[in-house]
Amino acid sequence: MGDNIVLYYFDARGKAELIRLIFAYLGIEYTDKRFGVNGDAFVEFKNFKKEKDTPFEQVPILQIGDLILAQSQAIVRYLSKKYNICGESELNEFYADMIFCGVQDIHYKFNNTNLFKQNETTFLNEDLPKWSGYFEKLLKKNHTNNNNDKYYFVGNNLTYADLAVFNLYDDIETKYPSSLKNFPLLKAHNEFISNLPNIKNYITNRKESVY
């Protein structure tokens, strides 16, 4: 981009982690500015909202030079288009976005369980296996059609949908380590993504966070 890039978020994975994974995969340098979430540390975030012209007074915020971008999903789509990881065709771009939207649905349910202690039994017995089955089926269809040893959800190359699914299960497995045991392709996909050199390096050196 040429401009200085700063990602503003809390000291957590949360809604910024997929953006960080995209930067890691692409090898893009940026400043990962994290706000504390407790006590006096939270004052810094309040001051930030006053100083920056943020559209919704929320983070994540991606600043590129003088440009201020808000809303995590919009930022992800913007970066994926700019760096050509959104799909090789108009239809593949749709499929990548479709999977990305599905990830948001189940990630929301996980967050309700993990952060707000809601409906854990329903999540584990119904939501998680149901959505994992959806993703397994989609991955199997694309993997079979392409007949290779790489695991992509869309087409023959990595898209942000792959990183989104990886981020979802990377998050879920911090609390439920055996969540992929009945979904061999999803498990292989996550292992494949986690072993991509830039992703592996990022995860190895990633700062531990509360959520």
Swiss-Prot record:
**Record: residues binding glutathione:** Q58, V59, Q71, S72, D105, K117, T121
Q: Which GO terms describe its molecular function?
A: glutathione transferase activity
Q: How is its activity regulated?
A: Inhibited by chloroquine, cibacron blue, ferriprotoporphyrin IX (hemin) and S-hexylglutathione.
Residue ranges of every copy of the GST C-terminal domain listed in the record: 89-211
Q: What class of enzyme is it?
A: transferase
**Which reaction equations make up its catalytic activity?**
RX + glutathione = an S-substituted glutathione + a halide anion + H(+)
Under Enzyme Commission nomenclature, its number is: 2.5.1.18
Using the record for this protein, list the coiled-coil segments as residue ranges, or answer none.
Answer: none
Q: Which cystines does this chain contain?
A: none
**What are the entry keywords?**
Transferase
Activity-pH dependence: Optimum pH is 8.1.
UniProt KW Ribonucleoprotein keyword: no
Q: Which family does it belong to?
A: Belongs to the GST superfamily.
Report the protein's function: Conjugation of reduced glutathione to a wide number of exogenous and endogenous hydrophobic electrophiles. May also function as a storage protein or ligandin for parasitotoxic ferriprotoporphyrin IX (hemin).
The protein's name in its UniProt record: Glutathione S-transferase
Which species does this protein come from? Plasmodium falciparum (isolate 3D7)
Q: Which gene encodes it?
A: GST
